[in-house]
């Protein structure tokens, strides 16, 4: 049986990266929330 998590840095960056977050309204909201909380890392 194939497992659900097959790590790939390219896919990781494309799906959860900073620029993909900025591309959508929801992603911008995520970044704003993480900034407000004081997260050291905003995105992958």
UniProtKB/Swiss-Prot annotation:
This is Large ribosomal subunit protein bL34. One of its GO terms (molecular function) is structural constituent of ribosome. PROSITE patterns: RIBOSOMAL_L34 (PS00784). The keyword Ribonucleoprotein applies. The lineage of its organism: Bacteria, Pseudomonadati, Pseudomonadota, Alphaproteobacteria, Rhodospirillales. GO terms for biological process: translation. Residues 1-21 are annotated as: Disordered. Keywords: Ribonucleoprotein, Ribosomal protein. Gene3D superfamilies: 1.10.287.3980. One of its GO terms (cellular component) is ribonucleoprotein complex. Belongs to the bacterial ribosomal protein bL34 family. The keyword Ribonucleoprotein applies.
């Amino acid at each position: 049986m194939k497992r659900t998590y097959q790590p790939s840095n390219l896919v990781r960056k494309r799906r959860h990266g900073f620029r993909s977050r900025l591309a959508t309204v929801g992603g911008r909201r995520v970044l704003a929330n993480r900034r407000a909380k004081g997260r050291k890392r905003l995105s992958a």
